[in-house]
Amino acid sequence: MPSAVDYSELGGSLPAIASLNASYSQASLSLPSPYYCPLPPGERKAFSDVRRTFCLFVTFDLLFITLLWIIELNISKSIWNSLENEVVHYNFKSSFFDIFLLAVFRFLCLQLGYAAFRLRHWWVIAITTLVTTAFLIAKVILSDLFSQNAFGYVLPITSFVVAWLETWFLDFKVLTQEAEDERVYLAAVNAACEPAPLICPRPVSDGQFYSPPESLAGSEDDLDEEGLGRRAVTEQEKAFVRQGREAMAVVEQILTQEENWKFEKTNELGDAVYTLEIPFHGKTFILKGLLQCTAELVYQEVILQPEKMVQWNRTVSVCQILQRVDDNTMVSYDVSAGAAGGVVSPRDFVNVRRVERRRDCYISAGMATNHNSKPHHSRYVRGENGPGGFVVLKSSSNPSVCTFIWVLNTDLKGRLPRYLIHQSLAATMFEFMSHLRQRINEVHVSYR
């Protein structure tokens, strides 16, 4: 298969490694990738786990209200006398029987709609919640329940709270999660049906990954044969190298699918944030902006000096290099600053990152890994980064400008609403670009 990149044009400092990298790129992209293998249709769950949990909660609603009602029937009289008074001689002002029927109504409607017919719309639960809320408000205003016993408070309040919990769970968990799973599945199918394009120039470093010294790629088969530079020796080091290459392959795929990027928002400086669904990794955020400086300057500031980034990048509070595996691969430890006005607390990350130089771009790609020197710390929630990175593209017409791309796929863990995470990530990316521009201006002033 012919290569889409002419590596003979690369600078003389990296010819051998560049040629190895070209062969690796062809091989890795011509074979099925684990990130783009769709689930066979026969193996897809017809009933999602989150929907099954919702149906179980609806059943709990009915059983819990029934149990409370039975307890209420046994408080003052025998259960049979109480049943006769509340059912046969039903009175709206004094009977709890209608609250039990309300629970039965919710159970039947929700189980039929979301278990039997597997609806993917909120209209059924909107009806049940509206009916429940209206009935309970009328019941509380017009009835004499509060003069009887504690159950005059317990049953209406419990029924009201459980009904709204069901609404929240369906709207924010079931429907959202199933829609995301469906998008991921369709993206996987589309990726499997289309031939993987060969990647051209690959740029810079990763969203939460601050990168290693200047070097290029090598073939894994040649790890033990290279005679120059640092090389991976142990099995763990070779595993780090493999992870770095996997992340690099995914970032390359993302770069070739720019026409599929979904525009999200922009700022006054023209920076734009896009999103793309990545099979088995979910939503990936992509920041793209133009910088008034050379690509080499960004390469030096963002990729080659990660420890110094904390001096000018306020979105990061800690950045340490835990291990330099080889000339292209390193393991880093990063702590992000809080976001969304403190709602999102600081997270720490352990990432493996791979850096490669190309004729017209620089790339640093990485993903989450584990390292013995940084176990989980009780002070931070340990986040997990999917494949992502920084990319710096040189301009063929004007060497004094460059295009900067940040690919960010991260799971912040914790119990945070997904919409809040997405908003905070986009804001953090714009903030990073602001700090980067300020740093570039400071460097330009110091050079004068």
From Swiss-Prot:
UniProt-annotated location(s): Late endosome membrane
Cross-referenced SMART domains: START (SM00234)
Posttranslational modification: Phosphorylated. Phosphorylation allows the tethering of two membranes that participates in the formation of ER-endosome contacts. Phosphorylation of FFAT motif drives membrane tethering between the endoplasmic reticulum and late endosomes that in turn allows the efficient transport of sterol mediated by the START domain.
Motif segment (FFAT): 208-214
Natural source organism: Danio rerio
Gene of this entry: stard3
Protein name: StAR-related lipid transfer protein 3
GO cellular component annotations of the record: endoplasmic reticulum-endosome membrane contact site; late endosome membrane; organelle membrane contact site
Highest taxon listed in the record's lineage: Eukaryota
Domain (MENTAL) ranges: 47-219
Residues annotated as domain START: 232-445
Keyword entries, A-Z: Endosome, Lipid transport, Lipid-binding, Membrane, Phosphoprotein, Transmembrane, Transmembrane helix, Transport
GO MF terms, alphabetically ordered: cholesterol binding; cholesterol transfer activity; protein homodimerization activity
Subunit organization: Homodimer.
Similarity-based family: Belongs to the STARD3 family.
Pfam family, one: START
Membrane topology reported for the UniProt record: Multi-pass membrane protein
Role played: Sterol-binding protein that mediates cholesterol transport from the endoplasmic reticulum to endosomes. The sterol transport mechanism is triggered by phosphorylation of FFAT motif that leads to membrane tethering between the endoplasmic reticulum and late endosomes. Acts as a lipid transfer protein that redirects sterol to the endosome at the expense of the cell membrane and favors membrane formation inside endosomes.
InterPro entries per record: MENTAL, StAR-like, STARD3, STARD3_MLN64_C, START-like_dom_sf, START_lipid-bd_dom
Transmembrane residue ranges: 53-73, 96-116, 122-142, 150-170
Domain notes: The START domain mediates lipid-transfer between membranes. It contains a hydrophobic cavity able to accommodate one lipid molecule, thereby serving as a 'hydrophobic bridge' across the aqueous gap between donor and acceptor organelle membranes.
Main location per the UniProt record: membrane
One Gene Ontology biological process: vesicle tethering to endoplasmic reticulum
Catalytic activity, as annotated: cholesterol(in) = cholesterol(out)
